[in-house]
Amino acid sequence: MAKPTKGKAPRRARRNISAGRAYVHASYNNTIVTITDLDGNSVAWSSGGTIGYKGSKKGTPYAAQLAAADAVKKAQQTFGMNIVDVIVRGSGSGREQAIRAIQASGIEVKSIMDDTPVPHNGCRPKKKFRA
């Protein structure tokens, strides 16, 4: 006896998130941009690797620019986000370009905050970071 087929499940209604935060983690090897809502739940993310770059090209400012634009585009299309606070961590070469790309993508930037972790004289750095 044939089993009755189930119909398609109804699609969930799109959550509309107007404001959120954009975290830019800029290391020397890569730049990762994560867009969250105000509670900290991840909405969209992108990086130099997800754009299609491999190896040392992931750490370039251009890859950071494309990653930031891609993450903002995902957040705008799926959740209708239009206001963000930008929080930057790290000192990689892509941090400035990522901020510029977020501003240029048509989303309103309310504030920019540098939250780079700085040790209070913790572990001894490697030779290249000790000057």
From Swiss-Prot:
One of its GO terms (molecular function) is rRNA binding. GO terms for biological process: translation. Belongs to the universal ribosomal protein uS11 family. Keywords: Ribonucleoprotein, Ribosomal protein, RNA-binding, rRNA-binding. It comes from Deinococcus deserti (strain DSM 17065 / CIP 109153 / LMG 22923 / VCD115). PANTHER family: 40S RIBOSOMAL PROTEIN S14/30S RIBOSOMAL PROTEIN S11. This is Small ribosomal subunit protein uS11. The keyword rRNA-binding applies.
